[in-house]
Regions:
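A glycine-centered beta-loop-beta connector
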Residues: 65, 73-90, 133, 141-164
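The C-terminal cap of the DNA-recognition helix in HTH/winged-HTH DNA-binding domains
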Residues: 10, 66-67, 135
Length: 181
């Protein structure tokens, strides 16, 4: 019985005081989970970005996507700044279009341009990033650093995907949430 109580104390559900004994802290497990998640920033969860230069062909974007085993590739300009995103869906639409030869068409012709992108910063909460992914029905967000305040000039510093969030949930369920701080 004492070991069960010790687990509940370590989990924050119970507390123990000398001469008082064990007592309920008022925290439920869902509240504790939300508290844990709210303290995690995008920088703690992000993965390495995969990018192609804007002058590459759509075919080269496909090759990069397969070699890196990702579903989204960021498109960068000559200065290394984010220009757009090309997803599997974008490439599939281009592949079934009879007017496009993927080996010849530039990736900028099939990408989603910067003006339509949703981005996150490393300081954003993972909850806010997850909300953006859900609300916009996308698989991946670029993690960016703003080059000039008030402009849309971004350096890509990472990416955050549904897989990152799934890994976080599994780690939290297995009690490994401390790995993200």
């Amino acid at each position: 019985m004492r070991s069960d109580l010790a687990i509940l104390v370590m989990g924050g559900i119970l507390d123990a005081r000398p001469k008082v004994g064990y007592f309920y802290t008022g925290k439920n497990t869902l509240g504790m989970l939300m508290e844990e998640i709210s303290g995690i920033c995008v920088r703690d969860l992000q993965s390495v970005p995969v990018a192609v230069n804007h002058d590459k062909s759509a075919y080269e974007a496909v090759i990069t996507m397969f070699l890196e085993d990702v579903g989204t590739v960021f498109v960068i300009d000559d200065a290394g700044l984010l220009a757009g995103v090309v997803s599997r869906k974008d490439l599939l639409k281009a592949a079934i279009n009879n007017n496009y030869n993927l080996r010849e068409v530039p990736v900028v012709m099939v990408m989603t341009p910067l003006s339509k992108l949703i981005v996150v910063t490393p300081e954003d909460s993972v909850a806010a990033a997850a909300r953006k992914i859900i609300d916009n029905e996308i698989d991946c967000l670029p993690v960016v650093r703003c080059i000039e305040e008030g402009s849309r000039s971004y350096e890509v510093v990472g990416r955050i995907t549904k897989t990152n969030f799934t890994r976080l949930l599994v780690d939290l369920a297995e009690g490994k949430g401390g790995n993200y701080r």
